Amino acid sequence: MAYPRSKRFAYKSWKSKSVICLFLICLLPVPTFSWSAQLTVRMAQPSTSLGWLSLYAARANGYFADEGIALELIIVQGGADIAAIISGSVDFDVTSTGGLLRAFSGGTDLLGVYNILGKCIYDLAIRKDTAQRLGITPAMPVPERLKRIKGTVIGAGSGIGVIPYQVAYFLVKEAGLEPGKDVTILAAGGGDSALVALRTGHIDIMSYPPPFPQIAIKNGDAISLVANTKGEYSPLNNFQSSVLVVRPEYAKKNHDTVSRVVGAMARASRWVAENDAKEVAKVVAKFFKNAPPDVLLSTVELIKPAVIPDGRMSLDGLKGVEEAYRVNGVVKKPVPWDHLVTNEFLPQ
């Protein structure tokens, strides 16, 4: 279509101004709408406990958001977190090193990409009246205490697949007793449920991570039977409790995503290690509203030394878990740790 000269000039003038305006707009700062740019990842967590201190710190301090990650956290109890990661229902799983071993023993290789905790944090607390009846006192050596628990019922996590159960099973066998015959080990659910079961006498002993054994002791319902958080039983002192795992094929296809999630965890672990326990407890307190402040603080003080600031895997710690699971009959073949864990995704 032919335009009159004046209209052609007006059109060109408008077009030129539009280009200039567009150029100037491009020079303006672009607002950061982090919510729209973030990548959503699904992560399983097998329990609510301070054993996942670095994860709670990362969430509270916004480290996942800083990495461009929108974290969708799903609590999956009873060892079902391993099934969730294997099936692809979740992308990541914060789990026990034992979970990695159980998957391997079942013929499935998962990949550990971050060392969450480098020591055993599963404590056993025994009812006061049961301890008195069996003649168990805190002054006794741990092996002597354990030899006296014949006939008791231990509540240990949410099922045979979880590490509190396996730690209890290992300690019973170390005492020369037979699980299922001399001592009953059963699932008691989450920590709050176990506290009720202990208080009402449905179980004699609880095997749980902090803060639950500490709460039972604080409430006057129990005394300590084995304080692994304090290194009371030396065979469990080299024990890498928990790891962040992914499916190997997911890690291969999503290297950047795994690196960002690991980066958030590493930043949180450094923050936990570098800050005072009071500050750490204050920050994560919103996740543990039912825990008395003094118990929460003392529990953080117990957990802090187990947090690995750089998240690097420890072969000695991994083999410590392997040995316990071998004694329990879960692991029967050599474990190729160089194939099951990696430090590849750690911040450089």
PLM feature segments, named:
Residues D66, A131-T137, G231-N237, K304-S314:
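Short, solvent-exposed loop/beta-turn-alpha elements that line the ligand-binding surface or hinge
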Residues V19-P31:
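Bacterial N-terminal signal peptides
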Residues L53, G118-L124, K128-T130, A222-I223, ...:
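Small-molecule pocket liners
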Residues M1-W14:
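N-terminal secretory signal peptides that target proteins for export/translocation
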Residues S193-K286:
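Pocket-lining segment of extracytoplasmic ligand-binding domains
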